[in-house]
């Protein structure tokens, strides 16, 4: 089975570090994954949100609301996902984002990952389940979106458990956030793996927010600064491309 795995690079999953940097004060990225629990129509849903490690950055909440909906079933509901408590470790961990970064841990651009989990019992199988969360707001340091600090942050994951009742979602193989230096060569692998061995298709999309702010969410593309889009997240002398496989 082929799965479409949309990479939400959004212009907020990439922090460009120049000699002068801006500190992030809002959300820097996120993703949603799921895995079957072994109980029919029951899935463990994980939400990961990323924020700047800087102490002045806005703190993320201890819970997030997850909407799960199916248009074909005319069904929508919300559940609360709690932040994961890890024994002998802080709830959120500041990490140095990769080995090809410009500076040491604790420098601008380092990221804090918050993981939330909730078990969702779907009422029945459907080809169009959507797991989604909407919150506010995006990183004020983003330069490719207009008014990023006032823009909502919507992420979605889509499940067809009619085709695959015990389906696993793709999972990023590496940390879903990176930073790099202007003018330096950079290689960034944001590939993913799938426990079911399904083939994956990658694509770039626009950054989104919800236009209705209620479950089920209605996705709306955010306005980009002239010259940028989901397909053109960075200015480059060579066009940005992605290998769909």
Language-model segments: which ranges?
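Long, compositionally biased, intrinsically disordered segments
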Residues: 22-245
């Amino acid at each position: 089975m082929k799965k479409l795995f949309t990479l939400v690079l959004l212009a907020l999953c990439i922090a460009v570090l120049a000699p002068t940097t801006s500190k992030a004060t809002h959300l820097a990225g996120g993703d949603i994954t799921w895995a079957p629990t072994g109980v029919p129509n029951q899935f463990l849903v994980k939400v990961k949100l990323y924020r700047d490690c800087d102490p002045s950055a806005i703190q993320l909440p201890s819970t997030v609301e997850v909407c799960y909906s199916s248009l074909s079933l005319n069904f929508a509901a919300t559940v609360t996902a709690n932040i994961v408590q890890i024994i002998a470790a802080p709830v959120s961990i500041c990490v140095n984002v990769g080995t090809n970064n410009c500076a040491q841990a604790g420098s601008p651009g380092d990221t804090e990952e918050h993981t939330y989990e909730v078990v969702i019992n779907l009422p029945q199988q459907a080809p169009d389940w959507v797991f989604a969360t909407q919150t506010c707001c995006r990183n004020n340091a983003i330069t490719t979106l207009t008014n990023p600090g006032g823009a909502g942050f919507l992420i979605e994951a889509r499940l067809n458990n009619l085709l695959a009742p015990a389906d696993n979602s793709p999972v990023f193989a590496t940390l879903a956030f990176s930073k790099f230096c202007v003018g330096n060569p950079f290689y960034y692998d944001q590939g993913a793996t799938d426990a079911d061995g399904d083939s994956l298709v990658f694509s770039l999309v626009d950054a989104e927010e919800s236009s209705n702010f209620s479950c089920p969410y209605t996705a709306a593309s955010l306005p980009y600064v002239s010259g940028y889009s989901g397909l053109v997240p960075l200015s480059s002398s060579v066009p940005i491309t992605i290998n769909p496989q």
